[in-house]
Amino acid sequence: MQWVAEQFESCTFLEEENVIRSVEFEEAGGILFCFCVQSKGFLRVDFRPLENQKIAVQLTLEEGAEAMVRLLCHGRERSDFTFRTLQRHVGNGSKSVVEVRCVCEDEARVDYRGKIEVPEHITGVKAEQKNKNLLLSTEAYVYTEPAMDIRSKDVECFHGAAVGGIDPEVLRYFSMRGMEKLSAQELYIAGFLN
C-alpha cells in the first residue's frame, strides 16, 4: 500500500473491521479500488486525489454493512479528473453514501459517473450518491452522470448532482466583515471541500 500515499495528497482508511479490500491498477492509467464490506462491517474512505487522476471505486455491501466514500478534488490550470463509482448492495439492510465534491479553476475538467445497484429481493437498503461541483472559471468544465438501477421496492435511494459558482451574496457577506475577496474565496473553498 506504500504507493497509495504517493498517488494522493490524502487517502484515509478508517474503521476497517470486516472489510476485504483489493487495490489494482487499471490499464487506462487509473486506479481501481474494490471494497467488499462484509456483514455488519463499516468502511469510511476519504480520497483527495492530486491533479490528472483517474479513480474508480466499487463498493459491494453485504447484510447490515455500511460504507461512506468521499472524493474531494481541487483542479487548477489544466487538471483533468475522471471518477467512477459503483455502489452494489447485495445484502439486506445495507447502507452507503458516496459524495464527490470538486472545485474547478482555470481550465480544469472533471468527469464523474456513478451508479447505485440494488437487485431484486434485497430490502431495507439506504443509498445516497451526491455530486457537488464549484466552477470558478468560464473555461472550467464538469460532466456528471448519476444513475441508479433499483430492482427492489423496499429501499431508500437518492442521487443528485449540482454545478455552480460561489454565491456573490456570500462574498459580499465576508466583504462587509472586512475580509478581502481572495481570502473569502479561499475560506469558502476550504469549507466546500471539508
Predicted features along the sequence, with ranges:
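Conserved beta-strand/loop scaffold segments within soluble protein domains that form the structured core
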Residues: 1-172, 176-179, 193-194
